[in-house]
């Protein structure tokens, strides 16, 4: 969730590289979808479903270009093609609600690109604004036949970006009710509650997920308990739930399954937490423990800096 709501999510580059095999498989299936749509359209050029899925495939290519390849020109080239086709479909049949998903996403993205890139969007013909995008996405989320769930998921993320937490929370709870085995929706509820300032409720939700991971409930067993506890402790610490956070950091440290980086970072965070709790001598011991591990993301420098200030 935190990645999706970041201001630069649609344009910022990451260090992640898609494995070549997965990339080839994705593009192969996308091409297969386009080929099947074209076969149907050769027989009946007015087949609405074939028109929709062909245009939607270009929308997926656009999403792939901007999120994986970070190729803005390629994203707008495919996005414009999808947008134009689906806008025409909507004009002919306004109640073809699935088409509003791609249209809405495109409009929202165009409306949110940084000002210094807007000239490029204008030159290559991209048009759209944030509010139109949200309006069209809501239509798809309420009335779509094929993409209602996907549209609701997109709306949830974008409502969080817009700080419309009550609406985002309503969707997250609805999706969690329909897909109770998805740990993602349960975590989304906790994260939205945290961002909305409802810290006690957020904490309780994180604990609920922890119990399901601990009990190895279906699908929740895909999360490793020690890694989840570390992330949970960081969340709890950020909310000021210091006792609960301390307990989880110590469990990560004591867990033989925890990787060394998690242990080192737990000692570092625990030192910071103990300083907040006015227990400097214990904090010093935690910072010293950090130095017994390898240096992970500057952990040694951070620990030495705090030790210098505490002595």
Identify the meaning behind each predicted range:
Residues 83, 87, 125-129, 134-135, ...:
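TPR/TPR-like (Sel1-like) alpha-helical repeat modules
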Residues 84, 91, 135, 141-142, ...:
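Amphipathic alpha-helical segments of tetratricopeptide repeats
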Residues 53, 60, 102, 154, ...:
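"A position-specific structural signal for the A-helix of alpha-solenoid helical repeats
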Residues 1-46, 53-95, 102-146, 150-157, ...:
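Short coil/linker segments at helix-helix boundaries
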Residues 47, 96, 147-148, 182, ...:
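Residue-level recognition of tetratricopeptide repeat
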Residues 60, 109, 161, 195, ...:
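Register position in tetratricopeptide repeats
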